[in-house]
């Protein structure tokens, strides 16, 4: 008798198109937003990334995606020092040029990530989260949510399971079925989250959750952070 596959388990099967789809969805919403902003808005501080402005975050994201497209992964790539160098290399660029590079990267990186066997999937999720950081800095609604949220949550669930992260069962306002995150071997009883998807994303990425209504039982917020 075969084992039953639950909706929560389906997320374990990698969809190679998912990271690129997430980038494309976010591109279609974020790029017009950026092109409509005043130049001075690019200097706004980004609370989730101390010391970085909106422009810094965008330059980091566009550089990372360009590296993916051009297959440039030297030793130390994506370290804080490497990220700072990538941003500094774009200091002489106009804001429009940074946005153009970001648009190209969000378009062209998807097929490369799809063919990488999963090792770059986390980068796509990180890009989507940084787009939320920018929306948050602008005071725009929908940060860490929107049309890309279902793909982002599925990616987050699979990445946390692959990493053997602390187990959590999430009952989300945004999904019909509970989402299972973290290791599933049964060594640890799972924690429980009740709330919305954007708040769950904030918890897993170390973003502030001030004012959000949610329940978290059996695990501490600091233990969920995949970037911590």
PLM ranges: what are they?
Residues 2-118, 122-129:
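Active-site-adjacent scaffolding segments
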Residues 2-19, 44, 73-80, 114-228:
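Structured surface interface patches that mediate subunit assembly and partner/cofactor docking
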């Amino acid at each position: 008798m075969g084992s039953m596959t639950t909706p929560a388990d389906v997320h374990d099967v990698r969809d190679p198109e998912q990271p690129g789809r997430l980038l494309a969805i976010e591109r279609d919403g974020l790029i017009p937003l950026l092109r409509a902003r005043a130049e001075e808005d690019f200097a706004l501080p980004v609370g989730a990334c101390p010391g970085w402005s909106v422009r810094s975050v965008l330059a980091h994201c566009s550089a990372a995606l360009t590296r993916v497209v051009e297959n440039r992964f030297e030793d130390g790539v994506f370290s804080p020092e490497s990220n700072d160098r990538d941003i500094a290399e774009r200091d002489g660029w106009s804001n429009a040029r940074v946005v153009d590079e970001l648009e190209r990267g969000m378009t062209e990186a998807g097929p490369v990530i799809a063919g990488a066997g999963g090792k770059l999937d986390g980068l796509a999720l990180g890009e989507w989260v940084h787009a939320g950081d920018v929306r948050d800095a602008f005071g725009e609604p929908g940060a860490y949510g929107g049309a890309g949220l279902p793909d982002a949550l599925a990616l987050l669930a699979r990445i946390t399971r692959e990493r053997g992260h602390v187990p959590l069962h999430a009952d989300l306002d945004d999904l019909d079925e509970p989402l299972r995150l973290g290791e599933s071997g049964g060594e640890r009883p799972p924690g429980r989250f009740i709330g919305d998807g954007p708040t769950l994303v904030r918890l897993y990425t170390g973003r502030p959750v001030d004012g959000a209504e949610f329940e978290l039982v059996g695990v501490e917020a600091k233990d969920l952070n995949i970037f911590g």
